[in-house]
């Protein structure tokens, strides 16, 4: 059964995708803009209902993820992707090491990102496949949402700055 998100706004420019963190299943869910006719497919709405101020999003994919734990939780709210980069990022938030790297990220809120596994600071984008991620056994993060490198690459290629993220 498809999951539908109905988004109401007077704004007329909507993004093709919407991201939602499902904390229960530890999944980052990806929704794609759908034709408004799906509203009538899933809900009993009167036939003369004007859906022009609504956007329908259908779930198309979900990605395994981990997110913030008790000591540093992931914020709850509705955000927009503020920026994105395919470049490496050096972080000092990992408790066991002074610095770690990840390769590519989407900025959601301040220092809260969607990014991939963490690597030792001597890894590069070209050599990271030769290294074991230092974060491979983690069950939570310092607040960011962490997905696989493959999924992150897909997000970087397809998600625009401004896309809604529900966390």
Show where each model-derived region lies:
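Intrinsically disordered, low-complexity
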Residues: 1-76, 167
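Exported/periplasmic cell-wall-interacting domains
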Residues: 72, 85-167
